[in-house]
Amino acid sequence: MALSSTDVDLVSGATFSAKGFIDAVNDAAKKAGVTLAKADKKALKKAARELPKTSNYDVVVIGAGGAGFSAAITARNAGANVVLLEKMPAVGGNSLISGAEMNVAKNWVQPKLGINDDSPELHAQDTFKGGDGKGDMKVINVMTHEALDAAKWCRDYLGVRFEDDNLFFFGGHSRKRALIPVGHTGTEFIAKFQAKADELGIPVITNMKAEELIKNKDGRVVGVKATMDGSEYTFNAKGGVVLATGGFGANPEMVKKYNPKIDERFKTTDAPGTTGEALYMAERAGAQLVNMGYIQTYPICDPISGAIELIADARFDGAIMLNQEGKRFVEELQRRDVLSEAILNQTGQYCWVLWNDNIGKISNTVKAHANEYEAFTKQGIMTTCDDLKCIADFTKIPFDQLRKTVKRVSDMAGKGNDKDFNHRSGLVDMQQGKYYVIKAVPSTHHTMGGVRINEKAEALTAEGKVIPGLWAAGEVTGVTHGTNRLGGNAYTDIIVFGRIAGEAAAKAAK
């Protein structure tokens, strides 16, 4: 590794919203047993001087998130000499700071919960429907059918630990199928990815920004031109290049260009490096960009920083969403786009997420996200109370209406029938405290558009022709999720297609 650091000064445009990213980087490093040295300009210049201006590899992977690591590790195990380039000072990107739940039909936890009727076909149908029929069904089917093997690879080969007694039931799904990593964040994955890359001797070069794809006279992608600290470098790739650079949710100008409705009201959940330049780099190499206007907002985010409130994942186990008047206004497990729009239609364009210990004992989010709990409490957007009067005083919700709503929810939970919004997972009795409540707003989260690929992760032109030597995986692609990505499908997507791309690129080098 040339340089890896969490020096915020090196993160272009870093703001308060990047703090969670920086904390997550340090957490992942600690769990992996890695110490990240604080970078300075002298260290960066020294690293730049020590790198050869031209390097030869079988496979070059751009982007050190979940898709990039999956591709690089798979390519290395297929016998390829591989390098992983990352423009930021540290690895992980969105894969690091996400909740990292992974949808897998017929996974090993489902039978413990009495779920025996799930299938890759049903997962594919949910995904296609969740994207309003705009996703590529061939690509979707590969994702859902390869999901179990990918999850077992993460568990058995990488050593990723998953909770063995619970799953998340994300909105838009017809079955509870999302595996939950220990710690409820991507730190578990990225720590294990980094450790495996180190074990395999894969060079991970941070602070290295890809600028241009190199094509030979036959139109094949054969390398990458990149820069570090103002110096130019060439990475030749005998087999080809895997693009795994993520989306563009942290680039507000680009977001507004493709979807003017997502304006200054929205902050972003994304890592600072998710700025989309690589999409234009791929386009210059002949790749078609598709579905660029489909940009997802995540409904439950910090009103101050825009970061996802992972602590509010109690919603997946029964927490309810209330408006300022103290009323439920939507089914809490609806699609993210539906929830976001519903919140924006409420007074103040925010909501309150409320749950009690009956739900907390299932979801365990307060314990899993203790740092969030402390931070959000200090910010004044979250509190814990023994009774509903305290909750009403904190939120300024009318107490009588709050009490009425909680009683109705509890009554319907006892009868097993949500007459108001048909909660698909079932409501939970909330008559007794302790109670937890947090204020939430939508933030820009996932960009569904990107490079057009086929089921082999090969990049395609506007005419549908394969661009030889170029593969793409993860959020940089644009055909899997249609208009809307269902929760828990991102990690499934990045692992499945990262592995496919890495194996194909390694094979092409032989």
Per-region residue spans from a language model:
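A glycine-rich dinucleotide-binding beta-alpha-beta segment and adjacent secondary-structure elements
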Residues: 212, 401-484
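Glycine-rich loop(s) and the adjacent beta-strand/alpha-helix scaffold that form part
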Residues: 230-231, 236-302, 497-500
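Helical element adjacent to the flavin cofactor pocket in flavoenzyme catalytic cores
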Residues: 181-239, 279, 283-285
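Beta1/beta-strand and adjacent pyrophosphate-binding region of the FAD-binding site
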Residues: 49-67, 83
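Glycine-rich FAD pyrophosphate-binding loop
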Residues: 77-97
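An anion/pyrophosphate-binding glycine-rich loop and adjacent beta-alpha core
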Residues: 275, 279-397
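Conserved N-terminal/central alpha/beta ligand/cofactor-binding core
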Residues: 90-203, 207-209, 321-329, 333, ...
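Active-site- and interface-proximal helix/loop "cap" or "latch" segments in soluble metabolic
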Residues: 1-43
